[in-house]
Swiss-Prot record:
Transmembrane segments: none annotated. Its cofactor is Zn(2+). The keyword Endoplasmic reticulum does not apply. This is Intron-encoded endonuclease I-PpoI. GO terms for biological process: intron homing. The keyword Glycosyltransferase does not apply. InterPro entries: Endonuclease_Zinc-binding_loop, His-Me_finger_sf, Homing_endonuclease_His-Me. Mediates the homing of a group I intron in the ribosomal DNA. Makes a four-base staggered cut in its ribosomal DNA target sequence.
Length: 163
């Protein structure tokens, strides 16, 4: 059953109200170019579901659960702000990217909607002060960035990513 725009907007409104309830965690992180910075992530605790309406989906992933017309829809909570965006860009599947590289973060300012190739490429990014070339700039250096890393990052081949 397809959702109406009103139903989608209701889900987004509910998500925006809920995301403010997540604890704000401060991280001191590498920004590239030898610089450090501070990021403020809204994190869901890993020990137990956070509040009514959340269900655990793996050790570090949670989904928001909402009933619409007596049908329970499970929304990937990172993708909720992007429900009105296209499912693909130039024929490539899209996903929510964490600009902060923190998979538990739900801060809307730390998320962007892009192709899975671009998302995976962020892992090799030198960071905002190290020469990030992404259309939406990373907030910190990628966790796999280091000697020999390329800014281009991997490309998807089947279900695997290769550099």
């Amino acid at each position: 059953m397809a959702l109406t725009n009103a139903q989608i907007l209701a889900v987004i409104d509910s998500w925006e109200e809920t995301v403010g309830q997540f604890p704000v965690i401060t991280h001191h992180v590498p920004l590239g170019g030898g610089l450090q910075g501070t990021l403020h992530c809204y994190e869901i605790p890993l020990a137990a579901p956070y509040g009514v309406g959340f269900a655990k989906n793996g050790p570090t992933r949670w989904q928001y659960k909402r009933t619409i017309n007596q049908v329970v829809h499970r929304w990937g909570s990172h993708t909720v702000p992007f429900l009105l965006e296209p499912d693909n860009i130039n024929g490539k599947t899209c996903t929510a990217s964490h600009l902060c590289h923190n998979t538990r973060c739900h801060n809307p300012l730390h998320l962007c909607w892009e192709s899975l190739d671009d998302n995976k490429g962020r892992n090799w990014c030198p960071g905002p002060n190290g020469g990030c070339v992404h259309a939406v700039v990373c907030l910190r250096q990628g966790p796999l960035y280091g000697p020999g890393a390329t800014v281009a990052g991997p490309q998807q081949r089947g279900s695997h990513f290769v550099v």
